[in-house]
Amino acid sequence: MRARFQSRRQSNLLTKRVIPCLDVDNGRVVKGLHFESITDAGDPVELASKYSRDGADELVFLDITASQEKRGTTRELVSDVAKVIDIPFTVGGGVGSVDDARDILLSGADKVGVNTGAVNNPALLTELMGIFGKQCVVVAIDAKRNHSEDSTKTMFEEDGKKFWFEVFIYGGRRSTGLDAIRWAKEAAALGAGEILLTSIDRDGTGDGYDVLLTQKTVDAVSVPVIASGGCGRPEDMCEIFQRSDVDAALAASIFHYEDRSVNWVKEILRDRGIPVRL
């Protein structure tokens, strides 16, 4: 599995990546709005196989209730998905220890996504980097705009409103008081090889990615950043690639519910001058 990840990653160094996401709950792919109002979107193995055939650069699998329910990600399902794809595979959900990460990698994942576990124990990132290598460690950050003024945070102003980006954990259900931009920088310093950045405000809306959140995070770290949350049409991906220096864009609804292949979206990106692998 590791060789598969390395060879494909090398070919993508100068291109933008398009990454479908499988949010999984009770063995089914689901999609929500602002991390709530969950609806069924299909079978994870069937969707994974489809996306792999249709030109996805990578696949992300997130067990969205594992941390909240204090359990690990379902290894059998991860293994079933890994068997039907030939692209880099990131799996997250409920990773709170080295053993959790090892289980996921042994089940067929190439990279491990860590969110709540890293916030609760930042030293875990350094442990994971030391054992599995930085290229296997993805820190997932779920961020939401907080409109309270706080001089200790990285403040922004848009349309006359001041705010900062706050980190949420346990599937977006618990606030942390952490500044998302600073946490991304700290996570990268501790051992994260990549940041998966999701805007809770934009999640499921189809209103486009949060360009400000994305670019400020890219500016703060020296590792690749994946933008997530808000993609409703190919033009949203065009915008995030044209208006930020992000390395990859993740999407779910545009692929789950629309009769559009990943390559179809990538052809639109290419026609707009955005370098992609076809």
Protein language model features and the residues they cover:
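Conserved, mostly hydrophobic/aromatic
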Residues: D23, Y51, L59, I104, ...
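Glycine-rich, proline-tolerant flexible connector loops at the mouths of alpha/beta enzymes
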Residues: E58-E76, T116, L196-G208
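Glycine/small-residue-rich loop that forms an oxyanion/phosphate-binding "nest" at active or ligand-binding sites
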Residues: T74-F132
